[in-house]
Amino acid sequence: DVYKRQFFNNAKKAKLSATKTLSTGERISVISKTIASDIATTSELGAGKRRVAHVMGMYGTILFWVGSVVMIFFYTSPGSTTPAVWPMIWHIGAALTVLGGSWFWFFLRVDVYSEAQPWFRVIKADLFVLALILSSLFGLIWSYLQSLNLVGRYDDMVFLALFIVANLVLFGGVYWSKFAHMFYKPGAAIQKNLAEADGSRDNLPPEADAPEQFGLGIKREEPKHY
């Protein structure tokens, strides 16, 4: 609630310092470009491993969730046949989520990559990423074990239970996790680009129209000073 108030209060302050009133068409143009670039391709992360991992995890999660919703709610009767494309989407989405999420978790997290913290250090804010990876991983294992038709064994039921628990943690731990991060970041990107377009710039000074004088600064080397 504190962050929400701060977000909207900043937006109100920015309106007061705007130098230009954007038309509806201009707003739509800015928002469309933001969705196509900053959100759909996570361009703010630049070209690199972190961006690839985020794109894999993001689109994997979208495919996984959409496939789950369609198969659960649209093909519910015993006589209905689920088109083969939906299980494919579900499995591809789960695999992308596991690959992108694991890449981020083990190698790209700031506290691991730049601060030398161990990968197994977990705080409340990590619940979302961990539960997201594990729910997809357990779902894939459960699906594989079902395909083996293991008569008289309960291996698949064990991973079904783990799959359910991971999803309960994922959605039940929203209060402590970074789940809201998925929605805050796009909203912040749209506000930032609108602020640049109307001249308010979030009350920051404009960029100087002059050549760089101080070199690369913090971009000179990777942040690994521990």
PLM ranges: what are they?
Residues V2-Y3:
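Short, small-residue-biased leader/transition segments that mark boundaries at the very start
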